[in-house]
From Swiss-Prot:
A GO molecular-function descriptor: ubiquitin-protein transferase activity
C2H2-type zinc finger segments: 176-198, 204-226, 232-254, 260-282, 288-310, 316-338, 344-366
Species, as recorded: Homo sapiens (Human)
Major subcellular location class: nucleus
GO cellular component: nucleus
Gene Ontology terms: biological process: protein polyubiquitination; regulation of DNA-templated transcription
Matching PROSITE patterns: KRAB, ZINC_FINGER_C2H2_1, ZINC_FINGER_C2H2_2
Lipid biosynthesis listed as a keyword: no
UniProt entry tagged with the keyword Repeat: yes
Short name of one Pfam family: KRAB
Name of the molecule in the record: Zinc finger protein 738
């Protein structure tokens, strides 16, 4: 029964009871290691169970089923307890023949009962338990006064227990109340989660990328991204990819596969986007127009370069002579003057030129062509 306080109820912070902002899954995961259903089950004594009305018993069923589903979702290896089977079938979880909960062996008192068992100052004891277990939740009317902690510290009074049941019935709906929007929360998990959202605190941080989350559950979902990250590796070059489809496209580089073919010229491409760009050439489409001079361009990058002419910008400067150019290609051509490089060679006579246009004009000598005629 001692596991109940750690598995179900919110826990105190280091400086007292500041909202008790960690829920059962978060606390158990970080503080206690692997979680079991025993850690998250709520157990009642026979008297406590009979004290609950139909709505409260329904609430109990929902909370227990949700706790079990959370364990399964987190991938924790847990066998299905008899209590869960019983709750799923809508049966009463209290075994009247054995006088115990279905999931647990017979006990004299549950941990919950021991904590709430009264001494003559019944209200004081109950308020102290509420403050200890629920961190006050912003309710200033719950004053902390001196009272007993458990059944071992005071004499058990039967008439006091009946008084406790009445007080519990009138007070329980206020325990899980959000002090910001005055919403009443009946689920043990949701009260902490809702309050954390108001504070904006994100205590759960991803060690891989540093991103923070307000819920452990959200952190778990986020980690799937990193698990998948670069999990698909190319056997040829060792390059890794996040998605299998990206790896498939990459492999075409090694295989030489060019499955995207242009119907007009028959040219093949690795990717559909490359084929789309190629089609523009055949169509003669010019989508990008200069607002200054009206000149059209097939690609936006070409228009961007062209605009530098109108702007008068010359960002590309020659280190040799300080001359500036509006386009990088112009600077590249200019540098040949300083280097003395002549990459364009005539196959007929071996003469070299630093400009391709100069080579083209030179070739006319060998062909005997005379394109320029006097009118």
């Amino acid at each position: 029964m001692d596991d109940l306080r750690y598995g179900v109820y919110p826990v105190k912070g280091a400086s007292g009871y500041p909202g008790a902002e960690r829920n059962l899954l978060e606390y158990s995961y970080f503080e206690k290691g692997p979680l079991t259903f025993r850690d998250v089950v709520i157990e009642f004594s026979q008297e406590e169970w009979q004290c609950l009305d139909t709505a409260q018993q329904d609430l109990y069923r929902k909370v227990m089923l949700e706790n079990f589903r959370n364990l399964v979702f987190l991938g924790i290896d847990v066998s299905k307890p008899d209590l869960i089977t019983c709750l799923e079938q809508g049966k009463d979880p209290w075994n009247m023949k054995r006088h115990s909960m279905v999931a647990t062996p017979p006990v004299t008192y549950s941990h919950f009962a021991q904590d709430l068992w009264p001494q003559p100052g019944i209200k004081d004891s109950f308020q102290k338990v509420i403050l200890r277990e629920y961190g006050n939740y912003g309710h200033k009317d719950l004053q902390l006064r001196k009272g007993c902690k458990s059944v071992n510290e005071c004499n058990v009074q039967k008439e006091g227990y009946n008084e406790l049941k009445e007080y519990l019935t009138t007070t329980q709906s206020k325990i899980f109340q959000c002090d910001k929007y005055v919403k009443v929360f009946h689920k043990f998990l949701n009260s902490n989660t809702h309050k954390t959202r108001h504070t904006g605190k994100k205590p759960f941080k991803c060690k891989k990328c540093g991103k923070s989350f307000c819920m452990l559950l959200h952190l778990g979902q986020h980690k799937i991204i990193h698990i998948r990250e670069n999990s698909y590796q190319c056997e040829e070059c060792g390059k890794a990819f996040k998605w299998f489809s990206t790896l498939t496209r990459h492999k075409r580089i090694h295989t030489g596969d060019k499955s995207y073919k242009h119907e007009e010229c028959g040219k093949g491409f690795n990717h559909s986007t490359t084929l789309t760009r190629h089609k523009v050439i055949h169509a003669g489409e010019k989508h990008y127009k200069c607002e200054k001079c009206g000149k059209d361009f097939k690609q936006s990058s070409h228009l961007t370069k062209h605009k530098t002419i109108h702007a008068g910008e010359k960002p590309y400067k020659c280190e040799g002579c300080g001359k500036a150019f509006c386009q990088f290609s112009y600077l590249t051509k200019h540098k040949i003057i300083h280097t003395g490089e002549k990459p364009y060679k005539c196959e007929e006579c071996g003469k070299a030129f630093n400009w391709y246009s100069h080579l083209t004009r030179h070739k006319i000598i060998h062909t005997g062509e005379k394109p320029y005629k006097c009118e």
